[in-house]
Amino acid sequence: MSPARTAARTARRPTRAQARRRRWTWFVIAALLGVGIAVGISKINVQQAIRDITLPLQHDDIIRQQAADKNLDPAMVAAVIYSESRFRDQESRAGALGLMQITPQTAHVIEHLSGGTSFVTSDLSDPQINISYGCYYLRYLLDHYNGNEVAALAAYNAGTGNVDKWGGLDLNQSDIAFPETRAYVDEVLQKQQDYRAQYADDLGLNG
């Protein structure tokens, strides 16, 4: 979801397209398992193929670089990208763009805060720029909420105005009024742990 969010938000049901994608994902997993068993592909290779489908990771070099530059956990950055776009360059119905689903309005704010001068909307399709802007905004939110990850992630999804109404610096997951935002925060925190466990080397967490 976009970092810029209006106050009136309600939980969204999965669309038909999302439901089809989920069914297709499980179909592919079942097919991989079947083929692996049939042709004797190693268990490790099958597990890696399933991981690449269920927990994708792309642009890990950019994620590592931007996380180090912004003093962020690269696993959290990967988890935000997963929850926002499943690592697909796309545009949401709200006009949010790219891997970290940033609206042009929010991008212009980030440009101003970071001292940029030449941003154009099409830049948000560039993974380097999109992840750079998303990481800058995530770092800004973490600093704004004194390191409270729940508050920062909720603000990334629903906006700082809503988070301030729900508890601000002291926000807990149970305080989040929007079911969609609560589910978003839950997912990011869970995927953060999954990325740490599954991609420690790729994300530079073992060095």
Feature-to-residue mapping (PLM):
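N-terminal Lys/Arg-rich, disordered targeting/topogenic segments
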Residues: M1-R22
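Low-complexity, intrinsically disordered/propeptide-like segments
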Residues: R12-T15, G36, Q192, N206
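Residues in intrinsically disordered, low-complexity segments of regulatory proteins
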Residues: R23-T25, K165
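Hydrophobic membrane-insertion alpha-helices, especially the h-region
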Residues: T25-K43
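Catalytic glycan-binding domains that act on GlcNAc-containing polysaccharides
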Residues: S42-G207
